[in-house]
Amino acid sequence: MEAFAVAIQSVITDSGFLAFTTGNAIMILVGLILLYLAFAKEFEPLLLGPIAFGCVLANIPRNGFEEGVMALISAGISQEIFPPLIFLGVGAMTDFGPLIANPKTLLLGAAAQIGVFVALGGAMMLGFTAQEAAAIGIIGGADGPTSIYLATKLAPHLLGAIAVAAYSYMSLVPLIQPPVMKLFTTQKEREIVMEQLREVTRFEKIVFPIISTIFISLLLPSITSLLGMLMLGNLFRESGVTDRLSDTSQNALINTVTIFLATGTGLTMSAEHFLSVQTLLIICLGLVAFIGGTAGGVLFGKLMNLVDGGKTNPLIGSAGVSAVPMAARVSQVVGAKANPGNFLLMHAMGPNVAGVIGTAVAAGTMLAMLSNH
C-alpha cells in the first residue's frame, strides 16, 4: 500500500499541472485560435495547422522535448535542414517561363522587396537590433521558408512570432493587396491588356536555373543552400528525364518536410519567448512590410508603364511578393474586375516567381551585412 502511495505521489509530482503557468494557458489558447483559423477558416491550413499544434505542445510543462523525435525536429530548423528542402519542392513546382519570356519583370520582383527594407527601418526605430530588424523585415517578402531561414540565422528567439506573422499575412494576401493596388492605380491603368508572352524553349528553361545559381551564389554565397535547392528542383521539372524526382520533390517530399518545419516552428512558441510586446510589434511590422512590398511593386509597374508607352499593366507589380501563385491570382482578379476581357495571370507569374528569387537575394544581402556583427 505504501508503494502505491509513493507511486501516486510520484505521478502528481511529475505532473505538468504543478508547473502549469498563466503564460502556458494563454499560449495554448493562442494555439487553439490558430488551429481554428487554419482548419475552420482555411488560413494557410497546411502550415498554420502544424504550427498551432506545435505551439500547444510547446506549452505543456515537463514535456521532455529535449530528447527524442521532437529534439530532432527542432534540430532540423536550427541546423537549417528543412527550409532548403522546402525550396527543392518549390522549385519543382515553379515555372520560370513567364519570367524568361519577359525578363524585365525581374525588376518588379526586386521592387516589391522595398517592403522588406521599410519594415527593417521601422523595426530599428522601435528599438530592435539590426539582426532582429532584418529577420522581421523579411516577412514582407511573403516567403515563409526564407523568413524561417533568416530568423534562425539572425534572431532565433523571434522565430515563432516571425513565422506566425509571415504565414498569417500570406493567407490574407487576397484581402491585403487589392485596396493597395486600387489606391495606387487608375481605372484606365487597371484596364490595360498586355500582349501575349512568347513561347519559351526547353533549352532556355534548363539554362536559366543553372546560370542563375552560379551567378547569384557567387554574389551572395550565404544563400547558396536555398537558391541551389530551388534551382535543382526546377531542373528536375524542366529536364524532361527526371519525372520521378520532380514528382517526389513537389509532392511526397515537400509535404513531409512541411509537417516537420511547421511543427518545429510551433515548438519555439513557448510562453517565455512569445508573450511579449515584441510579438505585437512584429505582427504590426509584418503588415507594414506586406503593404510596402505591394505598393513598391505597383509603383514600379507604373514606372514601367510610362517607359514602355503603356504596354505594362501596373497591377502585375503587386505579384512581386513571393506568395506563389496567390499574389499572381490577385492581380488577375483585380484586373478582370476592371476589364472582364483582361487575362493577367501569366504576365503576373513573371514578377511572382521573380519575387521568390528577390526575397532570397534580400535575405542573402542582409546575412552578408549582419551575420558577423
Language-model features, listed with the residues they occupy:
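Interfacial helix-loop-helix linkers and transmembrane-helix boundary segments
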Residues: 39-48, 67-73, 93-108, 242-251, ...
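Alpha-helical transmembrane segments
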Residues: 157-175, 285-293, 316-319
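Membrane-embedded hairpin module used as a gating/binding unit in multi-pass transport
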Residues: 168-241
